[in-house]
Amino acid sequence: MSNKPENLTLITDDGLRLDGRRADEIRPMKIEVGVLSRADGSCYLEWGRNKILVGVFGPREAHPRRSQRADSAVIRYRYNMASFSVEDRARPGPSRRSIEISKVSREAFEPVIMAELFPKTAIDIFVEVLQADAGTRTAAINASSIALADAGIPMKGLITSCAFGKVDGKIVLDLNKEEDNYGEADFPVAMTQDGEITLIQMDGNLTPDEIKQGLELVKKGCKEILEIQQAVLRKKFETPVEEVSEETAPEKGAEKEVLEPSPVAAIVEETPEEAEEPEVEISEEVEAEILASEVIPDFEDELEEEIEEELEESEEDLETEEEEFEEEALEEEAEPEEDLEEDLEEDLGEELEEEEEELEEEEFEEEALEEETELEASLECAPELKEFDEIEARLEKEDASIEAEEEIEPEAEEATEEGLEEEAEIEETAASEEENIEAEAEAEEEAEPEVEAEEISTEAEEAEEEPEEEKSEGPWKVVKDPSEAGTRGEKDE
Amino acid sequence: MDKKIVIPGDLLSDDVKKSGYGTYVKNDKIYSSLCGIESLKEDKVGVIPLAGAYIPSVNDVVIGVVIVVTPSNWILDIAAPYDGLLHVSEYPRRVESREMPEILDVGDSVILRVRDVDSSMKIELALRDPNLHKLRTGQIVEVEPVKVPRVIGHGGSMISMLKKETNCSIFVGQNGRIWIDGKDEDIELLSKALRKIEAEAQRSGLTDRIYNFLKNERMKEKESKPVEFLKNEKTDVSVAKEDHSEDIYRKIDVLLDPKN
């Protein structure tokens, strides 16, 4: 604005500016995304002779801690001009100007960044101006916007920024150095893609009409810039298309499911067939089952082992107890069974009980989250309890009265509630998988007070609803847990 | 390609009820808030992110590294903006506070489950599960959390293929940390493969691509190995010769020795 050389004409008579642009044209813009490997998101932008490098970090833990906000992320924007970025070496470090630009630029982004999703964190935006040629703050905002998107930070939209100014009494878009220095006004604006203005500054003098006129220009300029930004981002994330494979559709499906915010981490074992064939779309449930089932087998095995070991020891005890058992059995069929179970459990020791409790706890937890998990768990637990079944069978051979019990079973449905309850429980422990379902069906008919039983009833429903899916799980021979993988593992005990 | 890339601010749908992950609603319309792939389901419109940090959610299984041991908590880095807390009571057995560093010390890696995340993002972790344990061997490779589903593959196809082809054990944490264990060369191969997965995450037919990559690498190894082997043999032979000849000379010397 001052000491403009006499012979300098910023705009020629036919409306061309110093660099050959028209009044409503922006300088050529070149953008690269993801240029910094250590940053979460980055962008290098050249706009005319401006060169801007932006790195975005975060969301990350905010330090110092007192700067944290309990309900949202803090956005920190640092605009810095490299000392070599201008003709006369700029004093390094923050200056009044850079602090101000940092502040207004940060405020330009605050409306669009969904900071409330990341409480207690900080999102850092570092802007380095490597070469300045007027309009660096607008260039920096354009670049930051891309870098933020590149960092995967949720935003309501991209921010685009552009300046207009008054040069030789004319309103022009996107001033360059000379125009900025010798023009009459500079008016940077940043806006969302809907045209909502998030930054507006003015340096110089403009009339309201000129501002209106200028804002129209800026809108047009921002639209152009937005298109460039979008194109660059789309290109960055685009899939490099080489071979069009049939797999695409199912793969996408998988992605959807697995990418859902709360999937259980998968540990899937070797399934040779699966590697080759792009499976038929697997429904969510099946997938969930697969994931869920991976969690279970481990403790199932453990439990089985323990039971096997200790059952052998306990068999002798059982034999001696049989006499008592017989007597009681005559009085009431179900009760001795219960006793037997109790004895057994005592013999098996605390560990087993604990194990089972834990198992149940887990079942509940998982139930809350994934019903399938629970189904899986209960079904998979059933087989190992066959051990009980075997012993019972042996006892039944010896004792006719107990044999009779099986005949009574169908009648049991008409018997007292208590008896039924216990019957159901017996079935639960004793039955193999199919029998288990039957038993659960029985259990379903009664409203049982025990949580266990309730659980079973829901399980039964599910079991009836989706037996095919059970089978469809076939190829997915799940799962050896990593803790079993020979080379390593051990739990800390 | 039916994968549509969306960027923040893209209009996804006019039906407000369908708003899903990675979207926001404005003026009764759904817009994307992330860079990612549009995912359209019957009842939900969402965005599958292609970038972004790992934000813990309940029941995620993650790999954490102990950074602080306090009298009743272990504080773990779980590759998220937030640190995780593992309370002693969440350890499978009772632990006195003085023995805590013996069980898990600073720098130890552990597979954990996220037990709870509250609104102020306090992450509570748990170790009470047979699958969860300390990692004593192997290595941890970090990939971008958004690429984790690609490492697992469709229904686990990728991970099972990797296991089969490299003879390694793998555990993929939801937070992008991947634990691998096996022979040194297998681990090396596998981590190369993982890097490749990360780099080419958006390509189609990734599993086949990685399969071929592993095959090629194996071939290269086989080709390169025999050469080394021959070289070794040669040197061995020559060394043996020398020994032999020396031996003979000594014997001859002995024979020629007039004192005998």
From Swiss-Prot, chain A:
It holds the Pfam family RNase_PH. Residues 249-259, 383-400, 472-493 have a biased composition (Basic and acidic residues). Residues 297-377, 401-471 have a biased composition (Acidic residues). GO terms for molecular function: 3'-5'-RNA exonuclease activity; RNA binding. It is an enzyme of class 3 (hydrolase). InterPro entries: ExoRNase_PH_dom1, ExoRNase_PH_dom2, ExoRNase_PH_dom2_sf, PNPase/RNase_PH_dom_sf, Ribosomal_Su5_D2-typ_SF, RNase_PH, Rrp41. Signal peptide: none annotated. Residues 244-264, 291-493 are annotated as: Disordered. One of its GO terms (cellular component) is cytoplasmic exosome (RNase complex). Its EC number is 3.1.13.-. Keywords: Cytoplasm, Exonuclease, Exosome, Hydrolase, Nuclease. It is found in: Cytoplasm. Its main location: cytoplasm. The keyword Glycoprotein does not apply. The keyword Nuclease applies. Catalytic component of the exosome, which is a complex involved in RNA degradation. Has 3'->5' exoribonuclease activity. Can also synthesize heteromeric RNA-tails. PANTHER family: EXOSOME COMPLEX COMPONENT, EXOSOME COMPLEX COMPONENT RRP41. HAMAP family: Exosome_Rrp41 (MF_00591). Belongs to the RNase PH family. Rrp41 subfamily. Component of the archaeal exosome complex. Forms a hexameric ring-like arrangement composed of 3 Rrp41-Rrp42 heterodimers. The hexameric ring associates with a trimer of Rrp4 and/or Csl4 subunits. This is Exosome complex component Rrp41.
UniProtKB/Swiss-Prot annotation, chain B:
Keywords: Cytoplasm, Exosome, RNA-binding. SUPFAM superfamilies: Eukaryotic type KH-domain (KH-domain type I), Nucleic acid-binding proteins, Ribosomal L27 protein-like. GO terms for biological process: CUT catabolic process; exonucleolytic trimming to generate mature 3'-end of 5.8S rRNA from tricistronic rRNA transcript (SSU-rRNA, 5.8S rRNA, LSU-rRNA); poly(A)-dependent snoRNA 3'-end processing; RNA catabolic process; U4 snRNA 3'-end processing. One of its GO terms (molecular function) is poly(A) binding. It is found in: Cytoplasm. SMART domains: KH, S1. It holds the Pfam family KH_6. Residues 136-194 form the KH domain. Component of the archaeal exosome complex. Forms a trimer of Rrp4 and/or Csl4 subunits. The trimer associates with a hexameric ring-like arrangement composed of 3 Rrp41-Rrp42 heterodimers. Belongs to the RRP4 family. This is Exosome complex component Rrp4. It comes from Methanosarcina mazei (strain ATCC BAA-159 / DSM 3647 / Goe1 / Go1 / JCM 11833 / OCM 88).
